[in-house]
Amino acid sequence: MILDFNKIEEKALANFKGGEKALNAKMNVDENNKILGGRLEPGASIGEHTHETNSEIIFFTSGKGKVIYDGKEERVEAGLCHYCPQGHNHTLINDSDDDLTFYAVIPEHPAR
């Protein structure tokens, strides 16, 4: 199955997960997975949250920023991949002067 993010409408999700400004996202969602192309403008963030029933893989395609993962800061930039396993928490912050763009996959996990 091909997902053409060039044809998916971008939606601004204000204060996503309690973050600052908006997450601009192109999303494909089904019963088991969320796949999105995301863009955070300078100063925007995704608020801190815990992945209770899923995990998240984020591959950064442009820009720079930081992830706070289980309380520890990690610098991110194009070409890096961040993984947040089920049961862990993170936040994503664009603290640069350019857009931070990425693709994220959030697969649901069966009940333990």
Predicted segments, located by residue:
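A short, N-terminal "cap"/entry segment at the start of jelly-roll beta-barrel domains
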Residues: 1-34, 47
